[in-house]
Design a protein with these regions (language model features):
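N-terminal Sec-pathway targeting helices
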Residues: 2-13
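Membrane-interface motif at the C-terminal end of an N-terminal transmembrane signal
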Residues: 22-33
Length: 164
């Protein structure tokens, strides 16, 4: 029984693809990283009582933690340049104040980068950063990022839904 060369190559590529999928899905391999899965919309989360519009335009409110990612459309996974991200978090004393609020704009490739302190837990809540994302022709999204405590950086890709 002799197999042709193209069939062997195809079978080998299938085996490699299956192995790669298994390696990529190993627990802990991407700890602290949240990727946009097939452009499924990012989950909404509570706005909370501490949101205030008019946050200062800046890319950092502290040191020790970096949150970065890309804003994409759920329609076609295209990047969303110019998306406005408003972020707010508790300061080291567990309180919310203007020093820990920021607004920034995703660049031409939809990318954003935000520096802050690692937010503390408070009142039974785990450490978290609130985000409100808005862009022309898209529904506004309110979500939260939950940092992994022993990491100082995270990738948090965001997928927003076009307006109807």
């Amino acid at each position: 029984m002799k197999k042709s060369y193209p069939v062997l190559v195809r079978n080998l590529l299938i085996i490699i693809a299956v192995l790669l999928i298994q390696v990529i899905s190993l627990p802990g391999i991407h700890e602290g990283t949240v990727y946009a899965a097939a452009c499924a919309p990012t989950d909404e989360d509570a706005l909370g009582p501490f949101y205030r519009p008019g946050a200062p335009i800046r890319t950092s409110v502290g040191k020790g933690y970096v949150l970065q990612g890309v804003v994409r459309s759920s329609k076609d996974c295209a990047v969303v340049p110019g998306a406005v991200l408003e972020l707010w978090l508790a300061g080291p004393d567990s309180g919310y104040d203007d020093a820990h609020r920021a607004a920034l704009v995703a660049d031409a490739s939809g990318a954003y980068r935000f520096g802050s302190n690692l937010p503390p837990p408070y009142s039974g809540r785990p450490p978290h950063i609130h985000l409100r994302i808005s862009a022309k022709s898209f529904a506004t999204l309110v979500t939260q990022h939950y940092p992994v405590s022993d990491k100082n950086t995270a990738v948090f890709d965001i997928v927003i839904v076009p307006s109807r």
